[in-house]
């Protein structure tokens, strides 16, 4: 029976490969046609947005990547909390949640770094490399709130690195380092609300406060099951 099951799985995997290839080719064709039809009309605006007298592409990319980074930070923390409060057993499963917790965090750091460094191309805000790297040096634009965001990235990197040196620093130290995640989220939230140009928009405020509320709920649930454990 085990051999039959393995053979069936192999056949299903083999059948899936051509389907995936066809879907990939279809996506390439559709994307190519879309670009051929619309890119000529968009090209002047795109070029002006990148290399014109007042390029805005860098600012838009920074804003967009900031929102993505914040969302990934929230998602990584949510996975981390549901691992510890056993909710991951229901979905998506403990090992899957742990992997997602790790990889989503790496991706979030990448977007956060992109969010900062892409501003080197923006002529309006005119940041220098030192201002991107050194916290609280953006004297012309909200240095306190920008600095909190910069510190949050540094702490996030430290927390991420602790994944790979856990055996060296010990489980207790690793957990204490991981508790800094809540500080990182709070700093990122303050940075987004105070320094973000979209924070006054209802959708942005809803995203920020909704993510904070959901994490608070998960944390309270985690604490409650530890303080009041269920008995059989």
Regions inferred by a protein language model and the residue ranges of each:
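Membrane-embedded alpha-helical bundles that constitute the cytochrome b-like, heme-associated redox core
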Residues: 1-232
């Amino acid at each position: 029976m085990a051999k039959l099951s393995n053979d069936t799985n192999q056949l299903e995997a083999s059948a899936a490969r051509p389907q995936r290839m066809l879907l990939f080719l279809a996506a390439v064709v559709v994307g190519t046609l879309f670009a051929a039809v619309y890119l000529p009309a968009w090209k002047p605006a795109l070029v002006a947005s990148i290399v014109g007298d007042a390029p805005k592409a860098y600012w838009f990319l920074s804003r967009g990547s900031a929102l993505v980074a914040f969302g990934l930070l929230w998602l990584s923390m949510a996975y981390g909390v549901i691992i510890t409060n056993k909710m991951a057993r229901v979905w998506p499963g403990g090992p899957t949640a742990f992997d997602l917790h790790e990889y989503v965090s790496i991706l979030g750091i990448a977007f956060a770094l992109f969010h900062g460094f892409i501003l080197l191309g923006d002529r309006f805000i005119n940041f220098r490399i030192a201002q991107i790297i050194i916290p609280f040096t953006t004297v012309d634009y909200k240095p306190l709130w920008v600095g909190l965001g910069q510190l949050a990235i540094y702490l996030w990197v430290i927390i991420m690195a602790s994944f790979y040196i856990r055996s060296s620093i010990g489980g207790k130290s690793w957990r204490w380092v991981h508790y800094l995640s809540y500080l990182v989220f709070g700093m990122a939230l303050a940075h987004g609300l105070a320094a973000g140009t979209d924070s006054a928009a209802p959708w942005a405020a809803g995203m920020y406060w909704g993510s904070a509320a959901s994490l608070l709920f998960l944390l309270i649930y985690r604490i409650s099951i530890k303080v009041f454990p269920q008995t059989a």
